A protein has these predicted regions:
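NTP-dependent nucleotidyl-transfer catalytic core
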Residues: 1-304
Length: 304
């Protein structure tokens, strides 16, 4: 049950409440960015655990990654430092009272009273924006740069693009997605209640199994997985990315209407008809055979 996430939340709380621990964490980050091999190796071990967990969980939903780009590699490869030097040359920066490197983004329509972007901590270690800029500079030379972000990251992405414009570099395009909501509120937030995907998937299997038991005498785990995971995926994917998904299990597992079980059932029926036909299906349809108004209307509805 996602032990790494539980451990992270526990440790993060302790660090937030203990100034000494916070300083130790910052020291480790400093060593990481300055190429300490021991720290880098320990860091990689933790990242690998997280990545393997993601791959395992998402493979159950038939979701696969083509390639991984590690944010941390931009730290010890010094690419964040290179990006910072380029930004220094623009002259559009200052150091605040905490000695943090701050990019001045005046002149860009960002909808901020004070359009600035903080890039480093007071000790010089990088923050997320600097790493994202370094990544954008690198990936921007290798084709299209499209990022997928939560809708609450729109301003942040505009700030990153403003920095890239200052450097006269290619900006990144973004696809924004909204939140998945349950009856009790957001499914996932940085703070507060979090529903893990792993738990959400377990709930899908449980509810699909219950639904099948009510309909059929015999069921198997494979059928429950196909229907449960299908309901989960389709229930989210059928909604436009920019709209909130109001996820309701009763609707998602309904065998009637615009749902995954209905589509799966229709597919099974069609497959059964084709199997009984016992002939080779034509590769191209001959629409000249449709000589009645009703047939044409039916085809239009099926293709809509």
């Amino acid at each position: 049950r996602n032990d790494l996430a539980v451990a992270f939340r526990t440790k993060a709380k302790k660090v937030a409440e203990n100034e000494k621990l916070e300083k130790e964490v910052l020291l480790l980050l400093n060593k990481l960015e300055n190429g300490d091999k021991k720290i880098i190796n320990e860091f990689k071990k933790i990242v690998d655990i997280s990545i393997k967990g993601q791959i395992k969980i998402l493979s159950e939903l038939n979701i696969k990654y083509d390639k991984f780009d590690y944010e941390s590699s931009y730290l010890w490869s010094r690419k964040t430092h290179e990006a910072l030097k380029l930004l220094e040359k623009t002259g559009k920066f200052f150091f605040d009272k905490d000695n943090r490197f701050v990019l001045d983004e005046k002149g860009f329509e960002l909808g901020m009273k004070v359009p600035v972007l903080v890039l480093t901590r007071g000790d010089g270690t990088s923050l997320y924006p600097l790493r994202d800029i370094a990544y954008a500079l690198d990936i921007g030379t290798k084709g299209k740069n499209i990022v997928v972000l939560g809708e609450d990251q729109k301003l942040y992405n505009e700030q990153i693009n403003a920095a890239l414009k200052l450097l006269e570099k290619k900006t990144r395009k973004a696809v924004y997605y909204s939140f998945v909501l349950l009856d009790e509120g957001k499914m996932s937030t940085r703070k507060g209640n979090i529903v893990l995907l792993e738990d959400f998937m377990s709930e899908a299997l449980k509810k699909a199994g219950t639904e099948l038991k009510q309909r059929y005498k015999k069921i198997d785990s494979k059928a429950a997985k196909v229907i449960g995971y299908g309901a989960l995926k389709y229930g989210i994917l059928k909604v436009s990315p920019e709209k909130n998904v109001i996820f309701n299990w009763q609707q998602a597992l309904n065998f009637e209407g615009e749902t995954a079980p209905y589509i799966q059932y229709a597919y099974a029926r069609i497959s059964s008809i084709i199997k009984k036909y016992k002939r080779q299906l034509p590769k191209k349809a001959d629409f000249s055979l449709l000589d009645s108004k009703e047939e044409i209307e039916l085809i239009k509805k099926l293709s809509a």
